């Protein structure tokens, strides 16, 4: 399923002045991403401001994207919450949408379950979904994270076939080595880890920076595929400071500000994330220019 799919973008959700989803702007962003090398999309993830989207908005957003993109675009719909019953419902409904390929489920945040609880949570989602499930391990936002042993256990489930891992390259390497399952794909969720994760056997990157640097990231994966390590290193060194700069302020505000510069979206987020103010935008521009 994930073979040769290296660059997946966690797509933003554009909003209009009425604080509604801006579908014409969304289509412009999708066109831009596909033209610059994105092979798949994560819908309504963290970058898509999932915490501020209603259940109805998430369904409508997923339905729109699934109907808009070419059928060979990999689509991963985010079903995850910190409520197992709600996550199961989301997974069932989202997995029924035509052209949705997989379901994303995040480590439960705030209520801080232990490993046994997280395994039960993900198992319930995978049991309910009509599409394969991608785990999302992000302890920096969830306050809890899956251990390698838990990932190995979950990878044995017939309907869990991937993970978005945001911890460390060492963690990624351990997951790849210990799952010993060629059908289980490990993606980094950290743009700056792209080269290192791939070297350790990672499938690719679920990216934020690809909104702005898709061509360069696509070229990086091309260089890696043909073993041109020198070119890959040059590209990663060029990209890493820019990737980090896009998180100098709460995401996705920096990416939205830069896409606004390209006349693709309004410079709008949903609270509690605020758009960059003038000083922040100036600082971001300087960071990106200096790097």
Curated annotation (Swiss-Prot):
InterPro entries: Aldolase_TIM, DapA, DapA-like, Schiff_base-form_aldolases_AS, Schiff_base-form_aldolases_CS. One of its GO terms (molecular function) is 4-hydroxy-tetrahydrodipicolinate synthase activity. It catalyses: L-aspartate 4-semialdehyde + pyruvate = (2S,4S)-4-hydroxy-2,3,4,5-tetrahydrodipicolinate + H2O + H(+). Its EC number is 4.3.3.7. GO terms for biological process: diaminopimelate biosynthetic process; lysine biosynthetic process via diaminopimelate. Catalyzes the condensation of (S)-aspartate-beta-semialdehyde [(S)-ASA] and pyruvate to 4-hydroxy-tetrahydrodipicolinate (HTPA). Belongs to the DapA family. Homotetramer; dimer of dimers. This is 4-hydroxy-tetrahydrodipicolinate synthase. The gene is dapA.
